[in-house]
């Protein structure tokens, strides 16, 4: 079977590379979708889909599932083969996942908003993550349950000393390395479902991961990933639209949580002369 599979992929790759006209492309689609027959193996058919179409969205469409709503899984198995920080891991066929419209309450997920403060070692230029002395000196965060306006916790990780602040959990660290690890451990305990902030895709996420890389802290910083064996990564995402233009965003990706940059929403929904945080807050708050 291994030999036949190799031949099949080689055949498809050659035909894809030699396609130059619409007529040729049409023929190749028909060619692929017809059944294949290899020596000593049964014939198989292959259905084609858009390669760039997200598979999660495809499941939503096929099963009639609304994003962020409850679902019911009829037949599943407990998956003990993967080491995670989840309460339960299951395996099932996607056809066993069905919408549960009778449940209308919000899930008790956790939303965390964060912001970093950085230091310029030359006191003049804007902080550069590549410079040794341009450290992260503070990471502040506030977390909520989806269904409640009252914060679960207000948190501040600070480099060096800081006075106590009423209603805020303040953790003090002697080095930037300890601060970054402390921040990751805080996320590991809280396990937020959505992580947000203002311009985090344009500054905060990238700055944090560059400092993590500078201190060789990849393993330690990945301690909050839901799937323990997977590292936290910085992903590059390109987005082009008439409202936002062409942009490249740098996003910290971790299993089990979704990141959302509030700046993108503000730029898409409101027309302001300036999108600096202070100016936007003046307009909206």
Predicted regions and their residues:
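The two-metal-ion catalytic cores of nucleic-acid processing enzymes
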Residues: 1-263, 268-285
């Amino acid at each position: 079977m291994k030999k036949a599979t190799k031949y099949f992929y080689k055949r498809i790759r050659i035909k894809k590379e030699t396609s130059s006209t619409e007529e040729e492309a049409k023929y190749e689609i028909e060619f692929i979708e017809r059944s294949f027959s290899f020596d000593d193996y049964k014939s198989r058919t292959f259905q084609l889909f858009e390669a760039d179409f997200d598979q999660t969205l495809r499941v939503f469409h096929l099963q009639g599932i609304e994003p962020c709503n409850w679902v019911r899984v009829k037949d599943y198995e407990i998956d003990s083969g993967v080491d995670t920080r989840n309460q339960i891991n299951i395996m099932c066929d996607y056809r066993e996942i069905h919408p549960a419209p009778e449940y209308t309450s919000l899930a008790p997920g956790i939303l965390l908003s964060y912001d970093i403060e950085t230091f310029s070692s030359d006191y003049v230029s804007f902080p550069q993550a590549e410079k040794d002395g341009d450290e992260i000196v503070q990471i502040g965060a506030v977390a909520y349950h989806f269904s409640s306006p009252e914060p679960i916790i207000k948190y501040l990780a600070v480099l060096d000393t800081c006075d106590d602040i009423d209603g805020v959990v303040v953790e003090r660290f002697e080095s930037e390395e300890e601060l970054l690890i402390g921040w990751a451990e805080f996320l590991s305990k809280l396990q937020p479902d959505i992580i947000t902030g203002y311009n985090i895709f344009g500054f905060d996420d990238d700055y944090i991961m560059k400092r993590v890389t500078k201190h060789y802290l990849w393993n330690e910083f990945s301690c909050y990933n839901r799937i323990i064996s997977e590292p936290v990564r910085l992903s590059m995402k390109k987005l082009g639209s008439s409202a936002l233009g062409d942009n490249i965003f740098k996003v910290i990706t971790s299993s089990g949580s979704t990141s959302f940059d509030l700046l993108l929403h503000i730029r898409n929904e409101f027309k302001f002369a300036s999108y600096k945080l202070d100016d936007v807050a003046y307009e909206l708050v």
